[in-house]
Amino acid sequence: SMMGVFSGMEIAVWDILGKALNQPVYNLIGGQFHDRLRTYTYLYPKNSGDEGNLKNKGDDVYHDGDAAAERALDYIEMGFTAVKQDPTGPYSFQGGRELSLHELARSEYSVKRIREAVGDRADILFGTHGQMTTSSAIRLAKRLEPYDPLWFEEPCPPDQIQAIGKVASATTIPVAAGERLTTKQEFHECLKAGISILQPDIGRSGGIWETKKIFVLSELFNAQVAPHIYCGPIAHAAAAHVAFSSPSFLILETIQTEFHDNLLTRSLTWDHGYMLAPTEPGLGIELNVETILNHPYSSGGRLHLEMCNTPLDSNNQKKITEL
């Protein structure tokens, strides 16, 4: 929580500094390296709310591989060249569990169907949110290897860096991690463990300057960085500026909802799967104060990565709504 507060304040200072100097932030941290940024999206149901929640019994892209494949094609039509899915849920607070054969088969089938649908037009990113033991993660990775995912994300709990490193050494799929980590020191441990794709969330990792250091550190290990985004348009813009200035950038997560759009009166430009470099000073965005005031903070809604309180046994076949 403290790093989240610090990161937000630090990002605000960079926005102020850029506007004072009439320069986009990326010019203040090394200059522009990329002309545009490749982006990816999660597979969200067609009939979903702003948080990605399933509504009105729409297609369940999280557990139905056929629905996931169909939705992946929709995103390709939008211009995306990479899609992410996490079919290993539901999530439990306990973490580090052994997936059942049913869950292993469901995950493999989903990736298989997506690959059959998209062919070589899009990369598949496989998320797990740290839900597996080391052995279970390796078992799943072996089943996914034939479908050539771009990465296998956070296969073990984030505080088990050495365990994630063991998974990385046991599979041909690049292993990614870092959305819940802070500061360059923790990411250095990831790199030493053999994790080849770092995923700092700039709203948690320490802000713009600390995240820039994480990018630079990745170059020493011949690794790449794919910023994690789930904090809204300010974090999205801040991460984009660091990425535009960094050679080791791989791909940027993006979330496109009507609510996110309404939070801004000026936003960054997204064009057919790519984020274009802003030319306006600071972060290049302006907040819609009226919209923000009309949506005060509330702790009553669904949180990203909300865990169920029911421990899951090794033969779990239930969905989160059934627990």
Stretch-by-stretch model annotation:
Residues Y40-Y42, K84-D86, L125-H129, E153-P155, ...:
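A cross-family glycoside hydrolase active-site/sugar-binding cleft signature
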Residues D35, N47, M132, P155-P158, ...:
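Residue-level signal for alpha-helical context at structural boundaries
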Residues A82, W151, I197:
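Short, Asp-centered acidic motifs that coordinate Mg2+ and/or phosphate
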Residues S1-L125, Q131, S135-I138, K142-P146, ...:
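N-terminal capping/lid subdomain adjacent to the active-site entrance of alpha/beta enzymes
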Residues K142, D148, C156-G282, E286:
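Shared catalytic-loop signature of beta/alpha-barrel
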